């Protein structure tokens, strides 16, 4: 997992093909920038955020 600056820039680049925008993640994960909203301590396995939103079932 590569660190990213979503919290600062709202965007990160995970490898050559994956980009995450309008996101509040603090780390990029292998599953193309899965991330948690700032109110979530962690995301459930397989959770993928679209934009800066994430289903409540993702948040743990």
Curated annotation (Swiss-Prot):
Binding site for a divalent metal cation 2: 6, 12, 14, 25
Residues reported in the UniProt entry to bind a divalent metal cation 4: 32-33, 43, 47
Region Alpha, annotated ranges: 29-60
Chain positions covered by the region annotation Beta: 1-28
InterPro entries for the chain: Metalthion_dom_sf (IPR017854), Metalthion_dom_sf_vert (IPR023587), Metalthion_vert (IPR000006), Metalthion_vert_metal_BS (IPR018064)
Positions that bind a divalent metal cation 7: 49, 54, 58-59
Binding site for a divalent metal cation 5: 33, 35-36, 49
Molecular function via GO: metal ion binding
Keyword Metal-binding assigned: yes
UniProt binding sites for a divalent metal cation 3: 14, 18, 23, 28
Similarity comment: Belongs to the metallothionein superfamily. Type 1 family.
Main function: Metallothioneins have a high content of cysteine residues that bind various heavy metals.
Protein name per the record: Metallothionein
